[in-house]
Amino acid sequence: MNIEEFREYCLSFKGVHEKMPFPNVPDKYSRDVLCFYVADKWFCFVNIEIFDFCCIKCNPDESGELQTEYTGIRPGWPMNKKYWISVYFNQDVPDEKIKELVSNSYDIVVKSLTKKEREML
């Protein structure tokens, strides 16, 4: 999967928009971060230049199991490691599994929205 395929997949979910939220920070890595939002809440982000991993929300009960099963899934850098995981591309995590995890992340965020926010999607 390349950055355009990944981006297209993330944008395929209802109510999703993208933004590069750190255009003025000093370090280039942060400036190149593309975030995917639903109702202004992040569910996924990725560096568009390096495209080595994505960081996504994850059910805390599943996080440890996933990290045990795949070497390409690690605690979410630089986020709260209880609720976020980093999923590395081109390692042992199949593209279909990455898509499943991104979809789960989207669902976690949607479930956290208010009823009014969900109705506006």
Regions found by a protein language model. Give the residues of each.
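Charge-dense, helix-prone N-terminal extensions
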Residues: 1-121
